[in-house]
Every structure is written in structure tokens, then in C-alpha cells.
């Protein structure tokens, strides 16, 4: 595993030393020192899968330029990239013509190709989207047509008998079969991106929480103005360290709106954290599930619904629910950050969403606290699953972008900035699922936008 960390230097209490493993295996550790005047052509903020994929793509395209990745945690992929279902999505759900649809379909092929080239294990276990009620059949048909419009490969429709041939324990009336949907450890993929970036000459700094961006001309310090002739942007950290660069790209995930605001962007769309709690099938019951089993999405509700997800380690995750997290990194019910919570509740868009889906939200909280209630939803698809067959599993936090009217922003969003720094910053504002599947395709788009916006 690629691990990086900052340590205080014995020679200088304000300088930081980076420990960077040169490969995923963790061998061949070398030590570098981050100087207060470190200079780069481009700094990428965010060491998750989108940030690392973007850094990799940029250094492949521009090997003569200097790049660094700045990550606030002690390790890479600590949040959404390391807390997800592990599904390689096919692209069936998304609005035809949207970036989500386009980049997911591209990303699926790129992901399998990348994993093959880098010997990263995956399983192409497929997915069933199952209609269990008459009213879901028209929705299933519409979803099938949407997948075709999006260019999703090899989709078929099967009846009850066909469902049983694929998933013997699953009940349903009709189902869409997506044979190319798969599973992978996305954290492992992200670390491989980071390793590619490092091998290309890039630097990765962890423990570097970005607190502000400024152009040299915005500062009263003549030294910064002089440095600004070639590297006008200063990136400040909570450790009082600075990095100077020509351009900045942010892939901040749960903090993307706050990072964008630092360059003068509108805070909207606002990021609101939603926690998803999973159950896990006991090992002796994992034979009940062979591949991914998903419900037909209900257009009356904002989230996908509970599903069955096999994992690379042989376990099976069930869920998740979707509830407001009380902290942007709130993986447990009692994780509370007063700033995050006040920020969310003060936002008109969240209040609108809560009002519109109040009963849905109450049900989600209840199912998160009551295994039997969650299992009851799952029994629609596999009736033989009981509450005794499951245990509490992990949780993840989703960075959901909302507009001020309470609508979920359903597509990827890119933004710049205003003022002197505006032309030197590019923000990935909204990159929810299927961002992991789409990561290599997103990286290509970000690199294209950077080439247009910046002088690289």
C-alpha cells in the first residue's frame, strides 16, 4: 500500500518531512523535505481517486512540468474513495447526454483495461436490476431504454425464470441484466494511480490541509510578489507551510464547495454529507448472493434504495440507507461537527429537501437503527434472508451537492474562480457516484479543461 505522511523535521520545526513509499507494496521508502518556498507548475488538492487520477493524467500528458498532490489526511483515499460499495458501474441510471452517462460508460472500459495492465484484481460479476411489483415494470422498461441510449453494452431483459438462472435465491418478475458490471477495491485502484503519478516524477504530500489560495499580487509582501512572476499562486496550509505554483486544480470531495469558495466561487451547489450504513451477511449466508442485485429506482425518492453487493474479499454488503450525517466525516451516528451541522442546517436547500422528503428521511433513520426493518426491504428480493443472517457493517459518507431549492445536483460540476486567481484555478465541484468508475474519464476531461483554461 502506498503510504505518505508528514513528520516534523528535527532541523527546522516549521519544515515538514515526507515519507513516501515508492510502490504499492510499501517497499523502498525515501525521505524528502518540503521547503517553505517549494515551487510547482500545478498543485492538485485532494488525494482521493479523482484527484489522483487527474494528477496521473496530467503528468502523463505534460512530463516536463512539475506537479504535486496535496492531501489533508495522513494517507490517501481515506474518505469516499475508501468508503464505498466497490462497484464498477455500467452507466444505466444516468440521464442520456449527461456527463455522468458519458463518463461512466467510458470509465467502465478504461477501468477494466487499467486493472488488467496493473494486475489489480476485479470480478465482472454482473448486476440484476429487479422489478418485484407490477408498477415497477414500466420503470424497468424505461431504464432499459435509457441504458441503450447511453451506450451501455450487452444489456438484456429476463423474466422470473431468467432471474433464477442467474441468482437462484432471488425473487422478481422481470430484471435487467448488466453482465459487465463488476466489483473492485477502489482504494487499491486509487493508490495505483498515485504510484503512477509518483513514478512519473510527481510529489505527494499528506497532512497538508489547504486553508487558502492567493495570488502574489494580492499579498502585500514583496517577496511573494517577486516569486509571483513565475509562480503567482500561493497555497496555504494549516501547518503554516506554503507551496507556490502556477495553477491549482481542486478535487476536494466532501470539501469541494469550501475550497471553491476560497477562490471567489459561489458556495452553491452546496455539499451536504449523507451517511450510508451497510449490513453484512454472515459468512455462512454469502452463498445466497452471486452478483449485484439492485432495485428499480423509485422516481419519487432521491436515492437508489437498498441493494446486495458482493465484495472482493468474499463478503456481501446489504444496503445502504441514506441519512444526513452530522459531520462531513461523520461515519457514526454520534460523530458531530458543530460547524458542519450548522452549515448544513442553515442552508435553504437542505431544509427544502428535508421538508419534501420528511417521511422518507424518518424511515431511513429508523432502518439504520433497526436491522429487522432494513432486512424487510431486502426480503423483497431474497426472501430467505433474515435479521439473524446479518450484522452491522461499515458506513460511508457521500458528498451530495444540493441547489438552494433542495434539488440534488445530478451531474458532475466543474468551476473556476473570480478575480486575479480565477484564471488559475479549476475546481471539480461535484463528483458523486459513479465518480470512481468514471475516474480515468473524468481525469481526461479535467486535463482537457486545464489545457483550455491554463497555459501548460
Curated annotation (Swiss-Prot):
The answer to whether UniProt assigns keyword NAD to this entry is: no
Residues in a coiled coil are none
Write out the annotated subcellular location.
Answer: Mitochondrion
Q: Which Gene3D superfamilies does the record match to this protein? A: D-Amino Acid Oxidase, subunit A, domain 2, FAD/NAD(P)-binding domain
For this UniProt entry, what is the primary localization, expressed as one broad class?
mitochondrion
Q: What is its EC number?
A: 1.1.99.2
Which Gene Ontology molecular-function terms are recorded?
2-hydroxyglutarate dehydrogenase activity
Chemical reaction(s) catalysed: (S)-2-hydroxyglutarate + A = 2-oxoglutarate + AH2
Q: Which domain of life is it from?
A: Eukaryota
List the InterPro entries hit by this protein, alphabetically: FAD-dep_OxRdtase, FAD/NAD-bd_sf
Q: Where is the transit peptide?
A: 1-20
Q: Which UniProt keywords apply?
A: FAD, Flavoprotein, Mitochondrion, Oxidoreductase, Transit peptide
Q: Name one cellular component (GO) term.
A: mitochondrion
Q: Which cofactor does it need?
A: FAD
Q: Name one Pfam family in it.
A: DAO
Annotated family: Belongs to the L2HGDH family.
Q: What is this protein called?
A: L-2-hydroxyglutarate dehydrogenase, mitochondrial
